[in-house]
């Protein structure tokens, strides 16, 4: 999908540096000090327009949330969502997911959320899928070999690929749903994409995968 350029995005992010952390690598190993507490840190890789992470922050004030989004044209909307909720326990990073280990120390993160990631269906693009082994290794590092990944998608092919990838990597699947909205799962916070898919009656797939020490 082509992202529409927003020439004012840089200035807007700079004006909201209390939400979008510039030069986040300087806080590696120090993220608890950024939030001013020792609460668990959960990250969302590909936070998009911010509805999920803002909703989670409101629902769970005792958890610190960090949303990671590569595209400035998208993260500016996430900034607006965070400002609207006035949630003090959420920060945003305008970085590539490949930089996780540059930004977080080993074991500094407690959970990783992946919501409606780009499926990259062509085989030659497999390395770009956020659930391939290369990315799992990055998550494992910042999670310190513990914690969990919570993954949601509307794409059956990506879901099946991810289940296999998680299992082959040695993760334990503790929750699997082939139709989340028809399950008894409680506390679900929907993304913008999820609302659209649900309105069309499309099933939402969800899995929780854990590292066991």
UniProtKB/Swiss-Prot annotation:
Q: Where is the active site?
A: 118
According to the lineage, what is the superkingdom?
Bacteria
Q: Where does S-adenosyl-L-methionine bind?
A: 44, 69, 96, 118
* Residue sites binding substrate per the record: 122, 154, 191-194
This enzyme's EC code(s):
2.1.1.33
Instruction: Output the Pfam families linked to this UniProt entry.
Output: Methyltransf_4 (PF02390)
Q: What class of enzyme is it?
A: transferase
Q: Name one GO molecular function term.
A: tRNA (guanine(46)-N7)-methyltransferase activity
Pathway of action: tRNA modification; N(7)-methylguanine-tRNA biosynthesis
Q: Which PROSITE patterns match?
A: SAM_MT_TRMB (PS51625)
Which chemical reaction does it catalyze?
guanosine(46) in tRNA + S-adenosyl-L-methionine = N(7)-methylguanosine(46) in tRNA + S-adenosyl-L-homocysteine
Assigned keywords, A-Z: Methyltransferase, S-adenosyl-L-methionine, Transferase, tRNA processing
State the InterPro entries in the record. SAM-dependent_MTases_sf, tRNA_(Gua-N-7)_MeTrfase_Trmb, tRNA_methyltr_TrmB_bact
Give the CC-aspect GO terms. tRNA methyltransferase complex
Q: What does this protein do?
A: Catalyzes the formation of N(7)-methylguanine at position 46 (m7G46) in tRNA.
Which protein family is named in the record?
A: Belongs to the class I-like SAM-binding methyltransferase superfamily. TrmB family.
Q: What is this protein called?
A: tRNA (guanine-N(7)-)-methyltransferase
Please name the source species.
Bacillus licheniformis (strain ATCC 14580 / DSM 13 / JCM 2505 / CCUG 7422 / NBRC 12200 / NCIMB 9375 / NCTC 10341 / NRRL NRS-1264 / Gibson 46)
